[in-house]
Amino acid sequence: MLSDNPQALVSTSWLLKHLKDPDLRILDGSWYLPKMNRNGFEEYNQKHIPGARFFDIDEISDSNNELPHMVPSAQKFISRMKAMGIGDGHQIVVYDGQGIFSSARVWWMFKLFGKNNVAVLDGGLPKWTSESNPTDNIKPILA
């Protein structure tokens, strides 16, 4: 069990140290405004932190609400997390492709649904890659 960092923000060095921990779940929560002409899922498929799963903010929302990105029901959220291999005993680290933009929204959603072991990666993928930390394009086996 990861317990040496109960903070809401984790450093790239902390994540690198714990990258292979079986209790860690890394989420790429990248989402961009339409005018940015970027696609978080496509970027995830090209390059992500090893072991990261993609958290689709558009899909994990209340699809019955006409407003975009409204919080989903607890049932939908829990169902999607189980499908991603995320359970109560996991430490979650969220990042995004801008540094810290949409990852904060994902963090907030976990907190809203009572998950305390969740943190945002300080500097996100830009900082991670600027430090020459590893990336890959392999989708993890969800367990």
PLM regions: where:
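Cytosolic catalytic domains that perform sulfur/thiol-centered chemistry
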Residues: 1-143
